[in-house]
Amino acid sequence: MEGGRSWSIESYLNEYFDIPAKNPPGEARRRWRRAVGLIVRNRRRRFGRFSDVDAIDEAQRRKILVRVKQYHLPPELIEEGFCISPDELAAIANMREDYTMLRMHGGINGISRKIKASLEDGAKETDIATRQMLYGANRHAEKPPRSFWMFVWDALHDLTLIILVVCALVSIVVGLATKGWPMGIYDGFGIILSILLVVLVTATSDYQQARKFMELDREKQKIYIRVTRDKKTKEVLVHDLVVGDILHLSIGDVVPADGLFISGDCLMIDESSLSGESEPVNISEERPFLHAGNKVVDGAAKMLVTAVGTRTEWGKIMGTLNGDGVDETPLQVKLNGVATIIGQIGLVFAVLTFLVLLARFLADKGMHVGLLNWSANDALTIVNYFAIAVTIIVVAVPEGLPLAVTLSLAFAMKKLMHDKALVRHLAACETMGSASCICTDKTGTLTTNHMIVDKVWIGDVKFVGDKKNSELKSTISERVMAILIQGIFVNTASEVVKGDDGKNTILGLATETALLEFGLSLEEHLYDDYNKLTRIKVDPFNSVKKKMSVTIQLPNGGIRTFCKGASEIILEQCNTIHNTDGNIVPLSEMQKHNVLNIINSFASEALRTLCIAFKDMDEFPNDQPISDDGYTLIAVFGIKDPVRPGVKDAVRTCMAAGIRVRMVTGDNINTAKAIAKECGILTEDGIAIEGQQLNNKSSDELKELLPKIQVIARSLPMDKYKLVTSLKSMYQEVVAVTGDGTNDAPALHESDIGLAMGITGTEVAKESADVIIMDDNFETIVNVARWGRAVYLNIQKFVQFQLTVNIVALIVNFVSACIIGSAPLTAVQLLWVNMIMDTLGALALATEPPNDEMMKRPPVRRGDNFITRIMWRNILGQGLYQLLVLATLMVIGKKLLSIEGPQSDKTINTLIFNSFVFCQVFNEINCREMEKINVLQGIFRNWIFVGILTATVIFQVIIVEFLGTFANTVPLSGELWLLSVVIGSISMIISVILKCIPVEFNKTNTKPHGYELIPEGPEIL
């Protein structure tokens, strides 16, 4: 008791071993490392895989200083026809505000000539390999992969194993002096063999995990960008980018290399990652420098690549961090705390056991031969006592506890990668298991994102179905048709490119592609002509404005602006309309109402609606923006985007799992409601609301309304941000949110789990996310939640298993030392038990795949105790049974089983050891299910579990029957083998009895959508 407060495991863990899942501060990371203190066997293995806090701080402080100096042109560059060195080229972009070097080389045109690149056509395909060799590849400095023997070396740094090696060597020396060759080496050599086996198994496990993480890292680096090479626009991997490439940047991209601005529209760059400047910077011909690592927050542009990889400022900084490990997860830190507590208890038990054994030995020696009469055998006995004490520490300090989290996460992440989910941050995988709410986008996530123009409305006429194109051509005047096609072809961010096979391919977003395909199906031959028109100004689409506009110079003089976007927004900008005859007539309120009815009718059929409009001007207003009125409405489009197969079942699975699904979309509210109903998201008592209405609600109104909100339509990115923060602050929800745009970054960052779309998502969104959904599919999101729950549950199973072994092993050896004066479990035997418990146990239990039952229980509440009452019931029940059985064998086993003769002590100790191991084998099966009685269901689907159990039994037979000389065992009779198996198997009956004992749940509040929460574990005073 301290200050009137009771001490508990959870309060201790929360004080010292609690870190946030996202962006943990450096001090929190240092705090838990300090709290672990000396209770760690192998610091290299325990901490080596985590990121170096000091290295991160150093990288943040590092400033790259670039000085103008004399540059020399290497002969290999001259030979290939290049006229500027890589270092000088890299220095130009780093001059930032100083244009001296750029002007000295003749500006961007001079630079392009010196690197043999065309500002229109890019670099030649045949020069790519040469450019990579001379100017560098677009990769950061990478540490070479660690070999298997380096992991062996790490495992050998376990302090307790080192002490055991010393004990073994002393045992061999003393043994040779007393027993001679070869009898004298058996005890010590047995310990050394056991240590080597532990080291090899540990190193193999760590090596396999490292390989899995390397594969995941390679997947993370697969980023595609659009470049122009040899007059062709194509997508290439970011690592294949070379100096001289013409790179196409658009909103949401992360600039992958240093370069110079060629041309573009309203390009705004976030340079905070390098300069710390919070305000976006406008990049233009007057300020042309672009730097790797910066983000495009608005606009689009083409840039000439001038430096790649480690020659960029960003590349140098990233090179200092590369390979420095991963951030630790909250569960790993908490389990380090549990390991520390158990280790402290184990250390006390080890010291007490050694002192009791030593005291009994000295007392016995004093009574019989005197304390001054010492022999080599006496020294050997004390060495063995010390080895047993050290081995108790090996068993008691569960290194495998926090490492099992890494193993389970690595296994889950590898499986998820095959299932099209790339986990960027380890903590996200475990946090997703606690998700109670998913805020999802509609387009591409719930729908297929394969869009087609299904319906068109022009001048009071609706065109529907397969014949709409022919009917439209025959009904609409040539003037209206020409303006419509011109508006589609010039007002687009997509591009038609010809592939190597001669076929046209459209590069761009799905909505743009649908409109462009529609335009090409009407008048494909006009695309090249209209594409040559001079674009005076382009205002790109973003999720705030919900529209895109383009101003062009007409061939016969005059200016025309096209605008397309969200139907209601474009309609508000129009005061005239084109009729089918080609005449422009005023748009009356009645006609506007009719158009709104058309929009709503399209939307109610789950169609995405867009309007396109135009206005003509005599001249472009250079000194002020184009006004948002005076437009002429051309057409309303209804774009079909079918719901993905399986989404409805996935939503139903979420509901059963206590996960509320909310749809957040920029679409019309009628479209949103129709899609939400089709997906099963919008229920009869649910509410669909527009983003503006959400923002107008007071805090009290929002708190009352929030549990019922299922759809937010016409939402802005900050609406999504407000929804996330409100759910977290008002209802303590664990929120997962999807995002694909640059403006989604705040919501992705604020959420507990940010999910970026791999296909439609921008690089800025992906960079802010914790998980990338590679196929943009909602079913994949549900699969991530399923695996997250599996990770959490698997670690709980492993902790339950390991704590049972810890308790029994510690108490058996300590009580035996006190009562009998010897330890029934020798150092070699304890090392074998430690391997079953640590590495093999983790492999068996931490790699259990998810099952359907996991999605029929509520999520774990934020702040819930990790070790639950159910776990304590199972641990204490199994521990008590094992202690009673082993104590019985220890005290009256020889008499009960009529074991006699010179080998009777060794026989009963071997039986105790064998029974103890088989108790763990069967308890490992019990731990597959903490609550369900049927623990065998699906066991053969997990071949790792079955394989490890089989291997454990086989090795146990070998140790007992054939390695007795080293393991201090004797072969057992068939009856004693059967007895060992029966004793172990009874633990399964004990498990059934324990699971029938009701556990008192803590009183908890229910969540707003009505599910009960998992109970907390007991406090230990």
UniProtKB/Swiss-Prot annotation:
The chain crosses the membrane at residues 156-176, 181-201, 242-262, 338-358, 385-405, 807-827, 830-850, 879-899, 943-963, 974-994. It is a multi-pass membrane protein. GO terms for molecular function: ATP binding; ATP hydrolysis activity; calmodulin binding; metal ion binding; P-type calcium transporter activity. Mg(2+) binds at residues 740, 744. Residues 1-155, 202-241, 359-384, 828-829, 900-942, 995-1021 are cytoplasmic. It is an enzyme of class 7 (translocase). Keywords: ATP-binding, Calcium, Calcium transport, Calmodulin-binding, Ion transport, Magnesium, Membrane, Metal-binding, Nucleotide-binding, Phosphoprotein, Translocase, Transmembrane, Transmembrane helix, Transport. Activated by calmodulin. The keyword Zinc does not apply. It comes from the Eukaryota. GO terms for cellular component: intracellular membrane-bounded organelle; plasma membrane. It catalyses: Ca(2+)(in) + ATP + H2O = Ca(2+)(out) + ADP + phosphate + H(+). CDD domains: P-type_ATPase_Ca_PMCA-like. The active site is at 441 (4-aspartylphosphate intermediate). PANTHER family: CALCIUM-TRANSPORTING ATPASE 6, PLASMA MEMBRANE-TYPE-RELATED, CATION TRANSPORTING ATPASE. This magnesium-dependent enzyme catalyzes the hydrolysis of ATP coupled with the translocation of calcium from the cytosol out of the cell, into the endoplasmic reticulum, or into organelles. NCBIfam families: ATPase-IIB_Ca, ATPase_P-type. This is Probable calcium-transporting ATPase 6, plasma membrane-type. It comes from Oryza sativa subsp. japonica. The lineage of its organism: Eukaryota, Viridiplantae, Streptophyta, Embryophyta, Tracheophyta.
